[in-house]
Amino acid sequence: MSHTYNSLSNCISSLSASVALLNDSLKTIDNATKDIPRLKKVLSTNKVFGLVPESDLESAKRNIQNEIQPQINALVIKIEKELSKLKRKKTNLASKVDLQQVRLENAAKSNRDSLSGIKGITANRISKGDIDESKLARLKLLQNKKERLKYSLSRLNLQDKRARLSTIPSLPPHRDS
Protein backbone atom coordinates (compact mmCIF):
# COMPACT_ATOMS: atom_id res chain seq x y z
CA MET A 1 0.00 0.00 0.00
CA SER A 2 2.72 2.34 0.43
CA HIS A 3 3.42 2.01 -3.16
CA THR A 4 -0.11 3.04 -4.00
CA TYR A 5 0.18 5.78 -1.51
CA ASN A 6 3.31 7.07 -3.17
CA SER A 7 1.79 6.94 -6.55
CA LEU A 8 -1.34 8.63 -5.33
CA SER A 9 0.76 11.25 -3.63
CA ASN A 10 2.74 11.77 -6.83
CA CYS A 11 -0.49 12.09 -8.73
CA ILE A 12 -1.82 14.68 -6.31
CA SER A 13 1.39 16.67 -6.37
CA SER A 14 1.44 16.48 -10.17
CA LEU A 15 -2.20 17.57 -10.27
CA SER A 16 -1.45 20.42 -7.83
CA ALA A 17 1.48 21.50 -9.97
CA SER A 18 -0.77 21.41 -13.05
CA VAL A 19 -3.46 23.47 -11.27
CA ALA A 20 -0.82 25.99 -10.16
CA LEU A 21 0.52 26.14 -13.71
CA LEU A 22 -3.01 26.63 -15.05
CA ASN A 23 -3.65 29.39 -12.48
CA ASP A 24 -0.43 31.14 -13.51
CA SER A 25 -1.42 30.77 -17.15
CA LEU A 26 -4.88 32.22 -16.42
CA LYS A 27 -3.33 35.19 -14.60
CA THR A 28 -0.96 35.77 -17.54
CA ILE A 29 -3.82 35.53 -20.03
CA ASP A 30 -5.97 37.87 -17.90
CA ASN A 31 -3.13 40.39 -17.72
CA ALA A 32 -2.55 40.12 -21.45
CA THR A 33 -6.22 40.39 -22.44
CA LYS A 34 -7.56 42.95 -19.96
CA ASP A 35 -6.57 45.80 -22.39
CA ILE A 36 -8.41 44.25 -25.37
CA PRO A 37 -11.66 46.31 -25.05
CA ARG A 38 -9.64 49.52 -25.08
CA LEU A 39 -7.52 48.31 -28.00
CA LYS A 40 -10.65 47.30 -29.87
CA LYS A 41 -12.05 50.79 -29.46
CA VAL A 42 -8.74 52.45 -30.37
CA LEU A 43 -8.17 50.30 -33.41
CA SER A 44 -11.69 50.57 -34.76
CA THR A 45 -12.00 52.89 -37.79
CA ASN A 46 -14.68 55.48 -38.14
CA LYS A 47 -15.72 56.37 -41.67
CA VAL A 48 -15.51 60.16 -41.62
CA PHE A 49 -15.35 60.91 -45.34
CA GLY A 50 -16.97 58.72 -47.91
CA LEU A 51 -15.35 58.34 -51.28
CA VAL A 52 -17.50 59.04 -54.30
CA PRO A 53 -16.59 57.58 -57.67
CA GLU A 54 -15.42 60.10 -60.27
CA SER A 55 -18.13 59.02 -62.69
CA ASP A 56 -20.77 60.08 -60.13
CA LEU A 57 -19.07 63.48 -59.79
CA GLU A 58 -19.00 63.99 -63.56
CA SER A 59 -22.64 62.98 -63.82
CA ALA A 60 -23.63 65.47 -61.09
CA LYS A 61 -21.65 68.24 -62.84
CA ARG A 62 -23.39 67.55 -66.15
CA ASN A 63 -26.81 67.56 -64.48
CA ILE A 64 -26.17 70.92 -62.80
CA GLN A 65 -24.79 72.37 -66.02
CA ASN A 66 -27.83 71.16 -67.97
CA GLU A 67 -30.13 72.79 -65.40
CA ILE A 68 -28.33 76.12 -65.14
CA GLN A 69 -27.07 76.73 -68.71
CA PRO A 70 -30.50 77.59 -70.22
CA GLN A 71 -31.14 80.07 -67.42
CA ILE A 72 -27.74 81.68 -67.95
CA ASN A 73 -28.32 81.91 -71.71
CA ALA A 74 -31.73 83.53 -71.17
CA LEU A 75 -30.22 86.08 -68.78
CA VAL A 76 -27.40 86.88 -71.23
CA ILE A 77 -29.92 87.48 -74.03
CA LYS A 78 -32.01 89.70 -71.74
CA ILE A 79 -28.95 91.70 -70.73
CA GLU A 80 -27.89 92.13 -74.37
CA LYS A 81 -31.35 93.46 -75.27
CA GLU A 82 -31.30 95.91 -72.35
CA LEU A 83 -27.79 97.00 -73.29
CA SER A 84 -28.92 97.62 -76.86
CA LYS A 85 -31.87 99.69 -75.60
CA LEU A 86 -29.58 101.70 -73.35
CA LYS A 87 -27.17 102.37 -76.23
CA ARG A 88 -30.03 103.63 -78.40
CA LYS A 89 -31.28 105.77 -75.52
CA LYS A 90 -27.79 107.18 -75.02
CA THR A 91 -27.56 108.03 -78.73
CA ASN A 92 -30.97 109.72 -78.65
CA LEU A 93 -30.06 111.71 -75.55
CA ALA A 94 -26.76 112.78 -77.10
CA SER A 95 -28.56 114.01 -80.22
CA LYS A 96 -31.09 115.84 -78.03
CA VAL A 97 -28.24 117.53 -76.19
CA ASP A 98 -26.66 118.55 -79.49
CA LEU A 99 -29.96 119.90 -80.73
CA GLN A 100 -30.56 121.86 -77.53
CA GLN A 101 -27.07 123.36 -77.75
CA VAL A 102 -27.70 124.42 -81.34
CA ARG A 103 -31.05 125.89 -80.32
CA LEU A 104 -29.46 127.81 -77.46
CA GLU A 105 -26.75 129.16 -79.74
CA ASN A 106 -29.31 130.11 -82.39
CA ALA A 107 -31.55 131.74 -79.80
CA ALA A 108 -28.68 133.73 -78.34
CA LYS A 109 -27.51 134.75 -81.81
CA SER A 110 -31.00 135.70 -82.99
CA ASN A 111 -31.64 137.67 -79.81
CA ARG A 112 -28.44 139.61 -80.37
CA ASP A 113 -29.28 140.11 -84.04
CA SER A 114 -32.86 141.12 -83.38
CA LEU A 115 -31.88 143.50 -80.61
CA SER A 116 -29.20 145.09 -82.72
CA GLY A 117 -31.57 145.18 -85.73
CA ILE A 118 -34.36 146.73 -83.72
CA LYS A 119 -31.98 149.22 -82.15
CA GLY A 120 -30.56 150.04 -85.57
CA ILE A 121 -33.99 150.45 -87.14
CA THR A 122 -35.26 152.41 -84.18
CA ALA A 123 -32.19 154.59 -84.17
CA ASN A 124 -32.51 155.20 -87.91
CA ARG A 125 -36.21 155.99 -87.66
CA ILE A 126 -35.77 158.14 -84.61
CA SER A 127 -33.09 160.01 -86.37
CA LYS A 128 -35.37 160.36 -89.38
CA GLY A 129 -38.22 161.30 -87.15
CA ASP A 130 -40.41 158.53 -88.59
CA ILE A 131 -41.52 156.28 -85.67
CA ASP A 132 -44.31 153.84 -86.35
CA GLU A 133 -45.18 151.67 -83.34
CA SER A 134 -47.35 149.27 -85.32
CA LYS A 135 -44.50 148.52 -87.74
CA LEU A 136 -42.15 147.93 -84.82
CA ALA A 137 -44.64 145.49 -83.23
CA ARG A 138 -45.05 143.74 -86.61
CA LEU A 139 -41.25 143.42 -86.87
CA LYS A 140 -41.07 141.78 -83.43
CA LEU A 141 -43.93 139.45 -84.37
CA LEU A 142 -42.16 138.39 -87.57
CA GLN A 143 -38.91 137.80 -85.69
CA ASN A 144 -40.72 135.60 -83.16
CA LYS A 145 -42.33 133.69 -86.02
CA LYS A 146 -38.89 133.22 -87.58
CA GLU A 147 -37.57 131.77 -84.29
CA ARG A 148 -40.51 129.37 -84.01
CA LEU A 149 -39.95 128.20 -87.58
CA LYS A 150 -36.24 127.65 -86.88
CA TYR A 151 -37.17 125.64 -83.81
CA SER A 152 -39.67 123.55 -85.80
CA LEU A 153 -37.07 122.95 -88.50
CA SER A 154 -34.46 121.78 -86.00
CA ARG A 155 -37.04 119.51 -84.33
CA LEU A 156 -37.98 117.98 -87.69
CA ASN A 157 -34.30 117.48 -88.52
CA LEU A 158 -33.82 115.68 -85.22
CA GLN A 159 -36.84 113.46 -85.85
CA ASP A 160 -35.51 112.65 -89.31
CA LYS A 161 -32.11 111.80 -87.85
CA ARG A 162 -33.75 109.56 -85.22
CA ALA A 163 -35.80 107.80 -87.86
CA ARG A 164 -32.67 107.11 -89.90
CA LEU A 165 -30.83 105.81 -86.81
CA SER A 166 -33.69 103.55 -85.80
CA THR A 167 -33.81 101.92 -89.25
CA ILE A 168 -30.12 101.06 -89.12
CA PRO A 169 -29.85 97.56 -87.62
CA SER A 170 -27.57 97.46 -84.64
CA LEU A 171 -24.69 95.05 -84.79
CA PRO A 172 -24.90 92.11 -82.40
CA PRO A 173 -22.38 92.26 -79.55
CA HIS A 174 -19.14 90.39 -80.07
CA ARG A 175 -19.07 87.09 -78.21
CA ASP A 176 -15.98 85.14 -77.27
CA SER A 177 -16.69 81.47 -77.76
UniProtKB/Swiss-Prot annotation:
Q: Which Pfam families match?
A: DASH_Spc19
Q: Which residues form a coiled coil?
A: 71-107
InterPro entries in the record:
DASH_Spc19
Which keywords does UniProt give here?
A: Cell cycle, Cell division, Centromere, Chromosome, Chromosome partition, Coiled coil, Cytoplasm, Cytoskeleton, Kinetochore, Microtubule, Mitosis, Nucleus
**Entry superkingdom:** Eukaryota
Where is the protein found, in the record's own terms?
Nucleus; Cytoplasm, Cytoskeleton, Spindle; Chromosome, Centromere, Kinetochore
Gene Ontology CC terms, in alphabetical order = cytoplasm; DASH complex; spindle microtubule
Please name the GO terms of the biological process aspect recorded for this protein, alphabetically: attachment of spindle microtubules to kinetochore; cell division; mitotic sister chromatid biorientation; protein transport along microtubule to mitotic spindle pole body
Entry keyword annotation includes Cell cycle: yes
| Function description | Component of the DASH complex that connects microtubules with kinetochores and couples microtubule depolymerisation to chromosome movement; it is involved in retrieving kinetochores to the spindle poles before their re-orientation on the spindle in early mitosis and allows microtubule depolymerization to pull chromosomes apart and resist detachment during anaphase.
Q: How does it assemble?
A: Component of the DASH complex consisting of ASK1, DAD1, DAD2, DAD3, DAD4, DAM1, DUO1, HSK3, SPC19 and SPC34, with a stoichiometry of one copy of each subunit per complex. Multiple DASH complexes oligomerize to form a ring that encircles spindle microtubules and organizes the rod-like NDC80 complexes of the outer kinetochore. DASH complex oligomerization strengthens microtubule attachments. On cytoplasmic microtubules, DASH complexes appear to form patches instead of rings.
Question: What family does this belong to?
Answer: Belongs to the DASH complex SPC19 family.
Protein name as annotated: DASH complex subunit SPC19
**Native source organism of the sequence:** Debaryomyces hansenii (strain ATCC 36239 / CBS 767 / BCRC 21394 / JCM 1990 / NBRC 0083 / IGC 2968)
In the record, what lineage is assigned to the organism producing the protein? Answer: Eukaryota, Fungi, Dikarya, Ascomycota, Saccharomycotina
Gene name, Swiss-Prot/TrEMBL:
SPC19
